[in-house]
Amino acid sequence: MTAFGKKWLTGLVTGALMAVSAGSLAAEQKTLHVYNWSDYIAPDTVANFEKETGIKVVYDVFDSNEVLEGKLMAGSTGFDLVVPSASFLERQLAAGVFQPLDKSKLPNWKNLDPEVLKLVAKHDPENKYAMPYL
């Protein structure tokens, strides 16, 4: 695989992993706890999301896979949505740190490209925990 392909796949599988179903949590509690790479979203993304949905976002960032993994492996983090990289995803799944996605609460799941989901499945074999991000 080319360097571009690996980079693309890593970005792609930097899947939105749910510690709980963000959709149901947001609907019930109106707060979404996100743990993402620093500088992954535009400065106004959270504010725009909050304005559009009425859901408050608590947005925390990390700057390395090791920091993310240390927090996840330590136990209950309280995060609803976590954005790991593909290279650490399989190990985190094996450790049981994520809950399965509730696809009934992801109405656009059906619109995802099957070829892209096959790439994600290389790290999450049944597409139970991860979904494409980029």
PLM features: residue spans?
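A generic structural signal for secondary-structure junctions
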Residues: 13, 73, 94-97, 102, ...
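Sec/Tat signal peptide C-region and signal peptidase I cleavage site
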Residues: 7, 22-27
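Short aromatic-enriched loop/helix-cap "lid" or pocket-rim segments at secondary-structure transitions
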Residues: 46, 94-96, 114
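Bacterial N-terminal signal peptides
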Residues: 11-21
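Bacterial N-terminal signal peptides that target proteins for export
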Residues: 1-12
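Early extracytoplasmic/lumenal segment of secretory-pathway proteins
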Residues: 27-92
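A structural signal for short loop-to-beta-strand junctions that line the ligand-binding cleft
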Residues: 77-81, 99-134
